[in-house]
């Protein structure tokens, strides 16, 4: 192994040759590829910060006027401004009994125990039917396999929220419970491709229809591109 590593320009200390496979591989790859900060360095160099890019992003996805206090707070990425969160994805909770909402905080600071308004995709200032009041039961910094619990998350960050998913179908806009200005939503997500597969299903046992419908609703909430429709055919 020493000969092979030296041919690659990798030189280890004598004690490192006695390491187990996993830590030994880590040491070898660290010398071969260099420090693991390359991706982070690339992000810092080329990806604009939330504060620098907020104004451009708001103009693309926000449906409300841009001369309001809410819009100005979002464009400044103000952690002290009115709360506005764009929920873009739902993930199964750890017990698989419901969903947690993943979104970006554009303004304000969301805190656990806070009561918020959840605005659905069909909400408008003239028709507030698609709006519910929900209490944030948990807040996490979501890191794929890991969820880091936090008391609050300020503007400019992504957050995973528990306890607010019941009325969310695909995406939603979260705003604080009370504010002096009208609330507007973010545009629903748009995808460049449409679904290419259509499947008709029915339960083998008609009495299990409610279970199947509940499963379809969960699929509809889990996958943004999926569309489910229920048709009752009388025979």
Where are these regions (language model features)?
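Structural and coupling elements of P-loop NTPases
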Residues: 1-235
């Amino acid at each position: 192994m020493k000969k092979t590593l030296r041919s690659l320009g990798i030189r280890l200390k004598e004690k490192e040759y006695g390491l187990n496979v996993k830590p030994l591989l880590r040491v070898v790859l660290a010398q071969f590829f260099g420090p693991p900060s390359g991706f982070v360095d690339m992000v810092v160099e080329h990806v604009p910060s939330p504060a620098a890019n907020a104004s451009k992003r708001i103009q693309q996805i926000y449906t409300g006027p841009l001369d309001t206090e809410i819009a100005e707070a979002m464009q400044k990425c103000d952690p002290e401004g009115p709360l506005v969160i764009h929920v873009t994805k739902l993930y199964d909770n750890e017990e698989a009994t419901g969903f947690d909402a993943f979104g970006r905080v554009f303004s304000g600071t969301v805190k656990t125990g806070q009561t918020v308004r959840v605005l659905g995709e069909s909400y408008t200032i003239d028709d507030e039917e698609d709006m519910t009041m929900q209490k944030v039961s948990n807040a996490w910094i979501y890191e794929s396999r890991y969820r880091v619990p936090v008391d609050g998350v300020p503007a400019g960050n992504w957050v995973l929220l528990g306890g607010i998913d019941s009325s969310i179908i695909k995406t939603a806009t979260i705003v604080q419970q009370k504010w002096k200005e009208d609330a507007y939503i973010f545009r629903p997500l748009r995808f460049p491709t449409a679904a290419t597969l259509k499947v008709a299903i029915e339960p083998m046992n008609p009495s299990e229809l409610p279970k199947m419908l509940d499963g379809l609703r969960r699929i509809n909430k889990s996958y943004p591109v999926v569309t489910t429709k229920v048709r009752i055919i009388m025979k």
